[in-house]
Amino acid sequence: MSVNADSQHSNNSSHQASEKAFDRARSLIPGGVNSPVRAFGSVGGTPPFITSAQGSTLHDVDGNSYVDLFCSWGPMIHGHAHPQIVEAVREAAGHGLSFGAPTTMEVDLVEEIDRRTSVEKARLVNSGTEATMSAIRLARGYTGRDKILKFEGCYHGHVDSLLVAAGSGVATFGLPDSPGITKAAAGDTVVVPYRDVQAVEDAFASHEGEIAAIIVEGAAGNMGTVNPRGFNAELQRIAHENGALLIVDEVMTGFRVSESGWYGKDGVAGDLTTFGKVVSGGLPAAAFGGKAEIMDHLAPVGPVYQAGTLSGNPVAVASGLASLKLADAAAYQTLDANADALAGILSDALTKASVAHHIQRAGSMLSVRFAEGEGANFADMKAADTFRYPAFFHAFLDHGVFAPPSVFETWFVSTALTGADFEKIAAAATPAAEAAAAATPSA
C-alpha cells in the first residue's frame, strides 16, 4: 500500500525542517532512509527527523515532541537515555571503543542470556539479521540438510532465503520477496501459513529428510502482532520427529515480553534461539545461542564458520548488560500494565467511532487489526481494512503521538510512560479513531 506523501500532515508548517532534511537525505541515501519502513511509504508524508529522546518522548528538528509508541522498533523498554544505561556506555567508551580481542564483559552478557533462557551457549553478533543468518548456517551445518521452513509474514531480517514471503518492511511495500534473491536461495526455503499445523506436517512429508530447521518468531510481530497460541510447541514436536531443529527468533520478543522472552511465556525451548533489540539496550548488538552440543559446531571448535570484527563490541555489551540489569520483574509488570492501558485506550476510541477492530496482543506487544476478531496469520492481517491505518497514524502524529508507521508493525510500550503520556494518548485517540472511520479505500 502506497500513500501520496503530499496528502498527509494536516499541519505541514510544523514539519518544514524535517521536509528539508528529507529532501537532502533522498539526494544522498536511497529513499532518504537507512531502513525502508522509516520512509513512511505505507502511510505517506514526511518522517520526522529526530534530534533527541528522553524517557518516553521523541523530539524532532522542528521542535515537535511525541510520545513514543514504537520504541526504536522494540529495544527501548526502559525509555530513552536511561541514566544507568547512558552512564554504562560512557564508562565503557572511556576505556576504548573496540579491541578485536576478548573481554570479560562479553562473557558476562552471554552468562546473563544463558541465566534467563534455555540457551546453554551463545555467541554475540552485531544485528538480528546476522543472528538469524548465523543460526540458519549452523542448523544446516549441524543437520547436513539444506532447506529451511518459515512462515508467511514472519520476518527474520534481510537474509536472502528468509525474505521469501516475509513480513515487516517487505509487507509494508507489498513485496512477496526481493529482487536479487536467487532461485537457488528461494528454492531452499519452504513457506507455509502461520499457525497451520497441518501445513507444516505436509511440508515435512513433501520434503522428507531435506528440512534442516523450522524458524519462527517467538510471537509474530511483523505482520502486525499475532499470538502463537500453542503453535510453537507443535513446531518443536514436528521438528524433532523429523530430525530437524527448531529456531526461535526472539529478536523482537526476547527480554521484551518477560525476563526470559517468549520462552518465559510458553516454555518452548528452541534448539537455537536468536536475540537482538533489548539485549543491546539500543546499540548494534545481537546474539544467537542454543544447546551446547549444537553451538560447539561453530568455529574455532567446529567446522561451521562464523565471525565478526565488531562482535562483542565493549560499548554495545555495556549497554546490553545495563539494560538487562534494569529488566527485572517490576519492569515487566509495568510494561504489561502500560500495554493494557494502551490497548484499552485504542479499543475504547475505535468502539466509540464505530470502527470494526481487534487489538492483537502477545504479551506487552500489540497492534490494531481493522476488522472484527483475532487475526491468526498473514492472510487474516492483510484481509482487514488496512486502508484505515494511514489516517489513524497521522492523526496520532499530528497530536503528538508517534505510532509505528505501518499497519504491519507492532506497537511497543516502555516503562518510562507516565500518566501525562496516557492522557495525551487518550486525547489523540479520539481524532485518530474518527479519522480511521472516515477513511476510504484508494482507487
Curated annotation (Swiss-Prot):
Entry EC no(s): 5.4.3.8
Record pathway: Porphyrin-containing compound metabolism; protoporphyrin-IX biosynthesis; 5-aminolevulinate from L-glutamyl-tRNA(Glu): step 2/2
Q: Which cofactor does it need?
A: pyridoxal 5'-phosphate
Outline the segment boundaries, as ranges, of region: Disordered.
Answer: 1-22
Entry keyword annotation includes ATP-binding: no
The answer to whether UniProt assigns keyword Glycoprotein to this entry is: no
Subcellular location(s): the record lists:
Cytoplasm
Q: Name one GO cellular component term.
A: cytoplasm
Checking InterPro entries in the record gives: 4pyrrol_synth_GluAld_NH2Trfase (IPR004639), Aminotrans_3 (IPR005814), Aminotrans_3_PPA_site (IPR049704), PyrdxlP-dep_Trfase (IPR015424), PyrdxlP-dep_Trfase_major (IPR015421), PyrdxlP-dep_Trfase_small (IPR015422)
Q: Which catalytic reaction applies to this protein? A: (S)-4-amino-5-oxopentanoate = 5-aminolevulinate
Q: Where is the composition biased (Low complexity)?
A: 1-16
- Keywords in alphabetical order: Cytoplasm, Isomerase, Porphyrin biosynthesis, Pyridoxal phosphate
One MF annotation (Gene Ontology) recorded for this entry:
glutamate-1-semialdehyde 2,1-aminomutase activity
What is the top-level taxon of the source organism? Answer: Bacteria
What is one GO biological process annotated to this record?
protoporphyrinogen IX biosynthetic process
Matching entries from PANTHER family are given as: GLUTAMATE-1-SEMIALDEHYDE 2,1-AMINOMUTASE, GLUTAMATE-1-SEMIALDEHYDE 2,1-AMINOMUTASE 1, CHLOROPLASTIC-RELATED
Subunit note? Homodimer.
Q: Which family does this protein fall into? A: Belongs to the class-III pyridoxal-phosphate-dependent aminotransferase family. HemL subfamily.
What protein name applies here? Answer: Glutamate-1-semialdehyde 2,1-aminomutase
Which species does this protein come from? Answer: Corynebacterium jeikeium (strain K411)
